[in-house]
Amino acid sequence: MMKNEVNTLEIPAISVILATKGDKLGFLKNCIVSLKKQTFRNFEIIVVSKKFPKQLEDLFESEHMRFLEEKGSTLGAARNFGVKNAKGKLVSFIDDDAEAPTDWLDKIYMTFSRFPSLCCLGGPHFTPKDESGKNPLSLVEGIFFEAHSEKTYFDKSAIAKIGGCNVTYKKSVFQDIGYINEKLRTCEDWEFQRRLAENGYSLRFDPEIWVLHHRQGLKHAFQGSSKSAPFFLSWKTFKLLRYDFFFASFYAMHSLFITLIIILFISPYFFVLIFLSLLFGYMGIYAVRTKIYDRRIFYFSLVILLTATKIFGFYFGLIKYGAFKLHTLFARSASSVENSSSRPS
């Protein structure tokens, strides 16, 4: 067997599941190419999508690559379908706009071999340096999130750090606690990890197991928020805040600072908007806890407060206008009465 061939005679140790909509073919190609360059060879690649990407057909001319057609509407549904068809004892998830270094699977396999009780392993996802300035979300996340990617975290404290674009599970845990929640359009990875932690499974965030992630910016910032809101505002989620409260509060306070500056110069309803700032700022904690802080934490409270400012300003102006009109009307009426009474009979 040649060095770069995959051992197809064995059952693969790892199944890499790559769920995609097929709308980012350039990124998808780079992701697949990065997986084919792995130094670890006993693995399979499963691409799950609604439609086969014909433009990349040549990349699938390999026995260790499979394409699965899945018509579900969520990422969770696609990944579940991949897990159910996976042959490996470990299943790794990577996003279609991410790229793995050549030793990514080697490090994953070695870590699971070193810690037999480990059930969930994740690592950081860094924005490529040449893209970090293309949108403010990438820049801000690069400064703040990556600063927290140098330590190893375990179990419940690891949940806030592990992202769905770079995570590996033992396949057996899906049979034990169920599959990913297919109703959620976002946060489904963290919801699954929360269930693992609550059932006593071992989780680990390892800064050495990283991928590059080409982030999509503002256009996906609020995707799926309405269906996921009941989850990340639930009491169970709130209880887990204590495991990473200061990490979450850091982002919330950043949000509060921005909104505070704005309301000081815009709205006469200072104390009302201070309350709203606190409310939506600390919703940022939930955003952090559900792994969506990279898209919402810096903008969510800002958008809401600007909207609130406009609403308050509108009603404030409307009330003032109404009061002015009423005052004018009464003034005219009083003036008419006064003029009538002052006329000689």
Language-model-detected regions and their locations in the chain:
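N-proximal low-complexity "stem/linker" segments adjacent to membrane-targeting elements
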Residues: 1-34
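Short, acidic, metal-binding catalytic loop of nucleotide-sugar glycosyltransferases
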Residues: 33-42
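Glycine-rich, basic loop-to-helix element that forms the pyrophosphate-binding segment
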Residues: 70-86
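Short aromatic/hydrophobic "clamp" motif used to bind/position activated sugar donors
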Residues: 91
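Conserved donor NDP-sugar-binding/catalytic core segment of glycosyltransferases
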Residues: 103-136
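Short, flexible, basic/aromatic active-site loop/helix in glycosyltransferases
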Residues: 123-124, 141-159
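A recurrent flexible, glycine/aromatic-enriched loop bordering the glycosyltransferase active site
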Residues: 150-169, 185, 220, 242-243
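Catalytic donor/gating beta->alpha subdomain of glycosyltransferases that bind UDP-sugars
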Residues: 181-185, 190-241
